[in-house]
Every structure is written in C-alpha cells, then in structure tokens.
Amino acid sequence: KKVTTIPDGKNHGLIFVLDWSGSMNNILEDTLKQLFQLVWFCKKTQIPYEVYAFTNDSWQLNKECDEDQPYTSYRNTSSDLLVDAWKENDINIDGCFRMVNILSSKARTKDVEKQMLNLWLTNCSFKYHYNHHFPHPAKFHLSGTPLNEAIICTKQLVKQMMKKIQKVHVIILTDGEAHQPSYNVDRSKFYDSFGLDHKGTRSINSTCMLRNRKSGKTYGLTYSNCSLKLIECIKDDLPDVSFIAFRVIERGGMTVSYTHLRAHETQPY
C-alpha cells in the first residue's frame, strides 16, 4: 500500500472575511493590524489565503453612476441579481451586496504590500472623518452588515480553494450581528401590484425553516440564529471546512454586547 505524506500545514488554506460596516469605524484600525499579522504569518508559512471584505456599498465598483444620481445612491440595485434566477422562498440577497477580494496569496509580495498600504490609508480616512489629507475610494465606503450574505458566499469560495488543498478555515472578523435576514415572496399572490415589480421580501422569523436542497436537511430559524444555521448548513455539506468567528468590540463594549445578546435570547421571535 502506497502512503503519501503531506507536510503539515501545506494542505491548509485560510479565508478571512472582514466586516466593512460603518460600526467598524472605531475598531477598524486595530482589526487591520491583527489581519495583517495573520496575512504575514500565512506568507511566512506558505499557507494559501484570501481576504474578502463584505459590504453593500461597493456594488458601484462595476457600474457607472447616472449623471443625475449621486454616487452614494442605491437606486436600481434590486435589478442587480447575484444569483442565477430569482426564486420564491429563497433567502434574499440584495443586489448591492458584494464580497471584495482585498488581499490574496496569489498576488506578488510587492502588490500585497501596496494593497495593505491602500487599506491602511483608507482606514485613516475613516478614522479622521474623511479628512482631505487621507483620500478614500469613493465607491468603497463603510456600509451595512450583510454578514449572512457573506456566509452564504463563503461556500463557493471554500469549494474553489479546496480544488488545490484539503482543509479550509474561514475566519470571520465582525463587530456584531448581521442585519435582519429576509426571504423572497411573490407579492402578486397577496394583492394586485398595479403593474409594479411583484418581487418582494419578508423578514425571517421563528416560523421559517432553512432547507438544504442537496441533503434535504432542515434547520429551524429565528431572527438571532440565522448566521449560525447557515454555517451549520455549509459544514454539513463540506465537513473539511471550519469556521472561527471573532466578535470585535471596542473598549467598554462588552456590557452592551452582552445585553444585546441576552435580549435576543429572551425575545419570542
């Protein structure tokens, strides 16, 4: 029997998922410091890595804005479908959502260092309240918290990385929960839409179930556990992936976070 020995650490890969939301403003600097340390560690040990920032603002990167619309406008994003086709009862993913690949082990060292500098200067522009001495990308503002959408997308990112390696670890860096998830509904079934687009959404609550179309397994959902159930669903399909989520909070924020979590645990959703 032939045995192939793979050097420890050479068959692992890391995917970092960074929260690019407005509430990260006060802690983005320290978060980037830790992220850069992890990236340098991966480079030193030759571990493949990808870093993505999740946002609902950078949809503007791949489209030109109308002259009569400000670049901050979210108009017409509902038509920017990020899935093959709109389906009723699917989890809704807004057209403005994007996963931006900001760092990659595939890039040259010189390019990675340049991009780190760009990210650091972008952080400085937020830290100093958009001071003109630190310009920032006009189409890459801090935004909302589409964490659930990001988790859904990690499945495809993991599958892509697993083509060359055996185990993938997903590291999530965020300061809080995702914004309230929703699912697609056909509004024409409930009332006359008067010629308007019949595609609508409803908030996910305790009456909803998440169904894995591949395995048929279902997962009970509430307002507060959607992120955990999405991760569980991915791990059931891809057992060689692990998730590590860090809740990043600023000094003195532990009490607020604990109170918020307790409120969701006792609220009858």
Ranges and model annotations:
Residues 1-268:
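Acidic, glycine-rich A-domain
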